[in-house]
Amino acid sequence: MFLLGDAFTAEAKKRNFEFYDPLTTGDSSLSSCVEAIIAAQVGDVEKAIRYGLAAILMDLANVGGNVKDGCHIASMGGSWMMMTYGLGGMRDDDGNLSFWPRRAPEDNAILRFPVTYRGQMLEVEIGLENVKYTLREGISLTIRHETEEIQLTRENPESVRPVSGG
């Protein structure tokens, strides 16, 4: 459902997540980040953050008790994916970069991340009410915010849109 997200309806994702989430053991260092992404996609932001923190803390808090054997590099990458694909709602379906950002549950929470896409650097900053897209490097980049197409250029590098997801 994550990798081929456009092949599932929102309702199918929600039904599947609600069915499988209680059955999933979560005993892999890779479970939490993907569970967080799907939780965010189906609108359960609090659960997304809970799963996301488990991925982030995998090594920092020695969750599995095995950091002495080495770091969980894939879980670290999964933490970034949870932030960008999960809470940021980033997708690259059919070669089109789009975002369906989720509203953070905390009043003062801000999520900011860079994305390099086709040689252009985009910064995404998600606040409580708005998301700001800024073209940091490059000439021109077309993205989608939910269903709206946005053209960012050197002359007009910034766009602010309301956050409706979450």
Which residues make up each language-model segment?
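Carbohydrate-active enzyme catalytic cores, enriched for enzymes
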Residues: 1-10, 61, 67-166
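Active-site core of glycosidic bond-cleaving carbohydrate-active enzymes
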Residues: 1-72
